[in-house]
């Protein structure tokens, strides 16, 4: 899956991030996302007719990714849905959210990477096939240090009243927001293609490394 394309810089209020040019990027608002998705899929299939058999898969995946991003409060959602010669496209997504929290006394939670990592739990897999999570810090060029988790995790389904989860490759990077006490930009990459976990970790790391706050 080591097929890298030209990067497309996407700008949103307060930040910018680069994703591969072949990725899908669209408005996640409910009133406009369906039209946006159908328009993009039609344009992509006109340019690449060989992808036509996967049309329904693309539309279904993109609609679900957009809905989940909206429910989770994401400001940005970029999606990968690539056909590498297999029967089903390989899918993944990256979202950016602005999150924050307060202590029981009402004080803003610290956003220093070391303080954030101290609050994040490592999870070891007890047996093959179990979920797991590692916690570390990374340095984002032009931004600075940030806390990060990555692993195979059971992710809650946004808005699901039954509390169901989906097992996924997940990387989350917590970037302190300059001048906003207690706020971090959460850059999250996920995919349900567990067999390609290491490849997705590389992709999510590469995309996150392009994150910048707008001047």
Residue ranges and their predicted role:
Residues 1-167, 171-215:
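N-terminal targeting sequences that direct proteins away from the cytosol to non-cytosolic compartments
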């Amino acid at each position: 899956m080591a097929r890298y394309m030209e990067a497309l810089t996407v700008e949103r209020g307060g930040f910018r991030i680069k994703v591969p040019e072949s990725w899908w990027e669209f408005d996640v608002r409910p009133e406009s996302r369906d039209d946006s998705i159908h328009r993009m899929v039609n344009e992509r299939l006109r340019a690449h007719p060989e992808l036509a058999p996967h049309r329904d898969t693309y539309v279904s995946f993109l609609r679900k990714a957009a809905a989940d991003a909206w429910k989770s409060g994401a400001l940005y959602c970029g999606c990968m849905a690539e056909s590498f010669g297999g029967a089903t496209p390989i899918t993944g997504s990256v979202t950016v959210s602005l999150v924050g929290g307060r202590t029981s006394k009402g004080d803003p939670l610290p956003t220093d990477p070391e303080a954030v990592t101290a609050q994040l739990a490592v999870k070891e897999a007890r047996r093959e096939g179990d979920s797991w999570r590692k916690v570390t810090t990374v340095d984002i060029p032009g931004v600075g240090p940030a806390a990060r988790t990555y692993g195979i995790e059971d992710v809650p389904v946004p808005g699901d009243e039954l509390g169901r989860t989906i097992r996924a490759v997940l990387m989350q990077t917590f970037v302190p927001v300059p001048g906003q006490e207690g706020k971090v930009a959460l850059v999250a990459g996920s995919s349900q293609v567990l067999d390609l976990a290491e490849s997705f970790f590389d992709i999510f790391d590469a995309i996150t490394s392009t994150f910048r706050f707008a001047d």
